[in-house]
Amino acid sequence: MIYDFRLTGTLTGTWGKRIAAVCLVLTAAIALPAQDGRTLPDAVKFKTLVNFDGTNGLNPQAPLVQGADGSLYGTAYSIYTGSGGNIFKMTPEGSLTVLYNFCAQPNCADGSIPNGLVLGRDGSLYGTTEVGGVSTNPGCGGCGTFFKISHSGKLTTIYNFCALANCTDGAYPNGLVLGADGNFYGTSEGGGSTGGYGTIFRITPGGVLTTLYSFCAETNCTDGGVPLDSPIQATDGNLYGTTQLSGANGGGTIFKLTPEGMLATLYSFCAQPNCTDGSFPQQGPLVQGANGNFYGTTRGGGANPNP
């Protein structure tokens, strides 16, 4: 554990009145070396480019991706009109255009609640929606989609999750990562062949989905369950990620998956007394540092419990 957060002070405000902003760190500041946890130098400047007010989107939660045209593309979780979120395009100067509003089709057949975007090898943007889409399985009125969108805003739904009996292909997908082979890799929070604890999958740009692993395949779910974000492909070619729940100690896991689909649990959280090593890994993919190690956060545990 590198740092243990502790909550101090009083939190105020309501979720319903949150206004999110896209911020830009000046290019000159991005090139500065890491400060090893110290205060950022005065040369680092932040500039607010867009204030989301509900009419242009609300609660953007995923990173932006830069297209070949130099524009920045992103998603907003939901919008004021009650729709299922949107995809937007923004110039580096801050001029924002909404490209697509989800739930534009009856019963949200085009998907709802988008995750982050990924730039494919063909220059198109790909992504997933957490819910919505067309499902033929009872009990799942739309378990998410995999889509492609052009830079002009033409959206094509490529795959509808829960297309197989009992949702063995997964349900409620998270974000994606582009693999070295040109395919996309991701996780789902539900579905799978072992009780609905989520999956790791590979999907081609054309929509051929292969389930690589279904969580809770081991007794007492010691392999983890319910991943909340995409894995990353490390320099060794394997996929690494986290699960929010289960594991040998019940606090979630860190896993490695080979391209052949062999999963190894690298760490089970809450292994130390009072979960001082952390518990319940936070939403957000791991980061591999230049030293080859992986970095991430948990939303529970630690040596400094909240007062």
Regions found by a protein language model. Give the residues of each.
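Extracellular beta-propeller repeat domains
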Residues: 2-307
